[in-house]
Amino acid sequence: MLAGEAGNLVAQMRRGVLPYCVLAMLTNKEQYGFELVHALGGIDGMVTGEGTIYPLLARLRRQGLVETSWQESAVGPPRKYYRLAEAGQAALAEFTESWERLRDSVDDLLARSAQEPL
């Protein structure tokens, strides 16, 4: 990686973990698309727009990881709500385990390399 490419690296990492972040956000609560966009916007480093979230939600639905239902809204037209499917729970559990191992390995390597050459 060359100097100045860190922004691209962060974007690639975010793109890789975003589906699992969305699955995690649906773990305990059904949400509609704009609600997810707004919530992600409040998390440092996860800012994303509707042009990213809606295609992602459609892909997660096609993969059977989320399910949808239409619900009436107090204001405006009905909204499509997304909830975590059983397959989504399994995918999130597998990702979480893999993420924890990878994160711990990288943290360990960075800590050791700061103290002594590897």
List the predicted regions and their residue ranges.
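Intrinsically disordered, low-complexity serine/threonine- and proline-rich regulatory segments
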Residues: M1-V17, F95
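Amphipathic alpha-helical dimerization/coiled-coil segments
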Residues: L2-G4, A90-L118
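N-terminal helix-turn-helix DNA-binding core of bacterial DNA-binding proteins
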Residues: V10-Y54
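Short, hydrophobic-biased segments on the C-terminal half of alpha helices
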Residues: Y54-R61
